[in-house]
Swiss-Prot record:
One of its GO terms (cellular component) is cytoplasm. It is found in: Cytoplasm. Belongs to the acetylglutamate kinase family. ArgB subfamily. Its main location: cytoplasm. It comes from Listeria monocytogenes serotype 4b (strain F2365). Pathway: Amino-acid biosynthesis; L-arginine biosynthesis; N(2)-acetyl-L-ornithine from L-glutamate: step 2/4. One of its GO terms (molecular function) is ATP binding. It comes from the Bacteria. GO terms for biological process: arginine biosynthetic process via ornithine; L-arginine biosynthetic process. This is Acetylglutamate kinase.
Length: 250
């Protein structure tokens, strides 16, 4: 969708909601850009689980999600994080609406192929009609990373993956994956640009590690599936690392 920008807010979403962030949003809207936000909430989910004495377990960077964890995840994402984000926009008189998988089956999903993860899924389809209708009315759309499968099970979805699926489905002109670092680092230097076919080499060399591995895998998917540009950064106002769908030279 021409002029559409998708932004994935970091795990501590409130850290991204600075005045510089909102000024960039306002500038984009003045330039007739349509904006979709996909938010995570891992920090808040973990905090709530600990307060309820529910064990926190992860596997390969994904939260193991049993029934209790799923209910906490839904409660925090839909009842705490998303309203905080939409309220911040409303305070600045910016039209916004929060959506989740329960709204017209917005994000269809299926279980990941790992029973040990529990109610963790992958997006199989993004119903873009509702999003496009809201964007046509210049309403910023805020989406929680939850999916529903054909049996109407709710599934926890990695927020980076969800953002990349949404951006690809909309054929967005740009996707910004906001995180807690200013880009992909090699030593102390930010790598300005990475081709999708360089990622495995950088991972094998130990340059890409930890949580950056699944983030780059998601970014590569978006770059290879029609998103105009994909940027990993900590701010909309910094250049970060651009992920490009091209063959690396050398």
């Amino acid at each position: 969708m021409e002029n559409t920008i998708v932004v994935k807010l970091g795990g501590v979403a409130s850290d991204n909601l600075t005045e510089d962030f909102f000024q960039q949003i306002i500038q984009w809207q003045a330039a007739n850009k349509k904006i979709v936000l996909v938010h995570g909430g891992g920090h808040y989910i973990t905090k709530m689980m600990k307060s309820l004495a529910i064990p926190v377990e992860t596997k390969n960077g994904l939260r193991v999600t049993n029934k209790a964890t799923l209910e906490v995840t839904k409660m925090v994402l839909i009842g705490q994080v998303q309203p905080a984000i939409t309220t911040a926009f409303q305070k600045r008189n910016i039209s916004v609406i929060g959506l989740n998988a329960g709204d017209t089956g917005l994000l269809e999903a299926d279980f990941l192929n790992d029973a040990n993860l529990g109610f963790v899924g992958k997006i199989t389809k993004v119903k873009t009609d509702l999003i496009e209708q809201l964007l046509s009315e210049n309403i910023i759309t805020v989406i929680a990373p939850l999916g529903i499968n054909s049996e109407y099970d709710w599934l926890n979805v990695n927020a980076d993956t969800a953002a990349c699926e949404v951006a690809s489905a909309l054929q967005a002109e740009a996707l910004y994956l906001l995180t807690d670092v200013p880009g992909v680092k090699k030593g102390s230097e930010i790598i300005g640009e990475i081709a999708t076919d360089e990622i495995e080499k950088l991972q094998n060399a130990g340059v890409i590690k930890g949580g950056m591995i699944p983030k780059l895998a998601s970014a590569a998917f978006a770059a290879e599936n029609g998103v105009g540009k994909v940027i990993i950064t900590d701010s909309l106002n910094t250049s970060g690392t651009k992920i490009k769908n091209k063959v690396a030279i050398g």
